[in-house]
Amino acid sequence: MSFDREEDQKLKFKTSKKLKVSSTFESMNLKDDLLRGIYSYGFEAPSSIQSRAITQIISGKDVIAQAQSGTGKTATFTIGLLQAIDLRKKDLQALILSPTRELASQIGQVVKNLGDYMNVNAFAITGGKTLKDDLKKMQKHGCQAVSGTPGRVLDMIKKQMLQTRNVQMLVLDEADELLSETLGFKQQIYDIFAKLPKNCQVVVVSATMNKDILEVTRKFMNDPVKILVKRDEISLEGIKQYVVNVDKEEWKFDTLCDIYDSLTITQCVIFCNTKKKVDWLSQRLIQSNFAVVSMHGDMKQEERDKVMNDFRTGHSRVLISTDVWARGIDVQQVSLVINYDLPEIIENYIHRIGRSGRFGRKGVAINFITKADLAKLREIEKFYSIKINPMPANFAELS
């Protein structure tokens, strides 16, 4: 796995006192079969967040872990929970909650891949598709780990399709999004907490920290270990960020076509703020003979899965999406992100541009702004302590 360790090691952390840093996976005292899975997956040595958080999760302590997008957060909690699972017991022991179906499915696959030599029984449980096949497998082989979205997981718990009495660990991935009022997951997550054993270990993972996470800390966590990236380190150093002032909204399309023609890119994601604009933009580009695919939350799950699979395997090179794709989806070859609209939620900026430059790679993020967006741009710069420069005239130099 290609990984810019030099960039990763520049990260500075604020952590709980006397926190041990493990420079190798061997020093973490992991199960042999788990180590085999880690190396087969392509990891050679732990990233900065992995070297600090995995041993804390394994120790059974509650953990709040923060790191920039693409630094191996998913593998951090996955390795921790796989180490904790008792393979002799076939009942549910670990539960992972994520804000989107795509992310929950991806995490489920990571659990299976890293746990390949352990023969762990892991399932992704999300809305939008039938559970008949998964339920048959769960009943036949047992279910030791579940990655899912809050609504579907809670529904299955209430219907007693998932038994939670032996759950040892709950992971909240992209916790700031999970707990935000806008998505409406917060009460569902609180209801899930109420169904878990009181001594259940809680791991909270997020790229940003906010008051909702602090509330969960107070209510459900016991003296958590904190592993936080210093605020000025969250600007994603490996990604060149530029702004293009288009003056008027209607000029964005022509600007996008100019960039499209000028850049040599591997893969690109274009973000819009509404589903309607995603559909409009993809139709306009297709009419202009550009090859693009699109995805948003109103599409059927089968359609979203096909779009994701085509993009992940490289069959399509340009994806237009709403923020449903901004969180944690790992496609290694994305080298360019274009914010056709600046994000309405300021924390989503880091999640969007983190789609390029995954896991320490170099990437480019281009932000289109009109006069009406200037205040929002200044807000983003202030929040992340960054300065986003105008894009140079020679587009080709970015590729």
Swiss-Prot record:
Residues the record lists as binding ATP: 67-74
Enzyme Commission number: 3.6.4.13
rRNA processing among keywords: yes
InterPro entries in UniProt: DEAD/DEAH_box_helicase_dom, Helicase_ATP-bd, Helicase_C-like, P-loop_NTPase, RNA-helicase_DEAD-box_CS, RNA_helicase_DEAD_Q_motif
PROSITE patterns: DEAD_ATP_HELICASE, HELICASE_ATP_BIND_1, HELICASE_CTER, Q_MOTIF
Primary location recorded for the protein, binned into one broad class: nucleus
Motif Q motif mapped to chain: 23-51
Motif DEAD box, residue range(s) on this chain: 173-176
Pfam assignment, any one: Helicase_C
Superkingdom of the organism of origin: Eukaryota
Domain Helicase ATP-binding, chain residue ranges per copy: 54-227
CDD domains the record matches: SF2_C_DEAD
GO MF entry, a single one: mRNA binding
Reactions accelerated catalytically: ATP + H2O = ADP + phosphate + H(+)
GO cellular component: catalytic step 2 spliceosome; FAL1-SGD1 complex; nucleolus; preribosome, small subunit precursor; small-subunit processome
Domain notes: The Q motif is unique to and characteristic of the DEAD box family of RNA helicases and controls ATP binding and hydrolysis.
Protein name as catalogued: ATP-dependent RNA helicase FAL1
Lineage of producing organism: Eukaryota, Fungi, Dikarya, Ascomycota, Saccharomycotina
